[in-house]
Amino acid sequence: MSKTHFGFESVEENEKAKKVAGVFHSVASNYDLMNDLMSAGMHRAWKAFTIAQANVRPGFKVLDLAAGTGDLTKAFAKAAGPTGEVWHTDINESMLRVGRDRLLDKGVVTPSLLCDAEKIPFPDNYFDLVTVAFGLRNMTHKDAALAEMRRVTKPGGRVMVLEFSKVWDPLKKAYDLYSFKVLPWLGDKFAKDAESYRYLAESIRMHPDQDTLKTMMEQAGLDAVKYYNLSGGVVALHMGAKY
C-alpha cells in the first residue's frame, strides 16, 4: 500500500484517514478556539476576505467542503437566500455535528452532509461555487479532491481554496517558533491536547506551497488559477475557474 504523510510522520494511506479523523474528533468541541490559537484570531479576517471574493449572489448553489463549524456556510447561505442552495459538508461526524448545531443556533437552516471531498456525491456541473477552507491539507489525495471539486462545478463557476501556506522568509523563524513551541503549549493548556495541535502545525509545513498548489489546481483542469497571499503568506486564497 502507498505511503503518505501524517504531519511529519510517514504512514499508510488508510492509516492517515484514521489519524486525521482522530484529531478532528478530539478538537471538534474546541475547533473555534483552535482556529483562534493557530491564527491569533486572524482567521476571521481571512474568511471575511474569502467571503468577499466569493461574491455569492441570490440563487447560487454552493458546496462548502470540510466546512467545520460553518463560518463560510453561514455567510454563503445568507447571501444565496431562499432561492439558493448551500451545502455544509464535512468528512468528520463530530465536526459536522458541531457545525450543524451552531448554524441552527444562529438561525441558519441549510443542509448538512457527511461528505468525502475525494468522492463528492453530486452530479457534474452542479454548483456555482465550491469552497474548502483549512481542509485541503488534511486530505490524502489532494489531486483527486481538486478534480472532484472541478467536476461538480458548473461551467462559469469557481473553486476556492483557503489554506495555510508558506510564509515569507523574514517571518519564518518567528513562525516556526510559534508553530512548534507555543501552539502545542497553548493546545495543552486550553484544550488538554498538545498532540493534535502539534499535528496541525506539522500538516501546514507538509502542505504544498502557493505555486505548487496553483499548478495542482491547473492540472486538475481549472482555468485562470490565481492566489492571494494573506498575512505574509501565512495563508493563501487560491481561486480557479471552470470554463
From Swiss-Prot:
Q: Which domain of life is it from?
A: Bacteria
**Which EC number applies?**
2.1.1.163, 2.1.1.201
Pathway of action: Quinol/quinone metabolism; menaquinone biosynthesis; menaquinol from 1,4-dihydroxy-2-naphthoate: step 2/2; Cofactor biosynthesis; ubiquinone biosynthesis
InterPro entries linked to this entry: SAM-dependent_MTases_sf, UbiE/COQ5_MeTrFase, UbiE/COQ5_MeTrFase_CS
UniProt-annotated binding residues for S-adenosyl-L-methionine: 69, 90, 116-117
UniProt cross-references to SUPFAM superfamilies, sorted A to Z: S-adenosyl-L-methionine-dependent methyltransferases
Query: Keywords of this protein's UniProt record, alphabetized?
Result: Menaquinone biosynthesis, Methyltransferase, S-adenosyl-L-methionine, Transferase, Ubiquinone biosynthesis
Q: Which PROSITE patterns match?
A: SAM_MT_UBIE (PS51608), UBIE_1 (PS01183), UBIE_2 (PS01184)
Record PANTHER family: 2-METHOXY-6-POLYPRENYL-1,4-BENZOQUINOL METHYLASE, MITOCHONDRIAL, METHYLTRANSFERASE
Provide the function of this protein: Methyltransferase required for the conversion of demethylmenaquinol (DMKH2) to menaquinol (MKH2) and the conversion of 2-polyprenyl-6-methoxy-1,4-benzoquinol (DDMQH2) to 2-polyprenyl-3-methyl-6-methoxy-1,4-benzoquinol (DMQH2).
Give the protein family.
Belongs to the class I-like SAM-binding methyltransferase superfamily. MenG/UbiE family.
Q: What is this protein called?
A: Ubiquinone/menaquinone biosynthesis C-methyltransferase UbiE
The gene coding this protein: ubiE
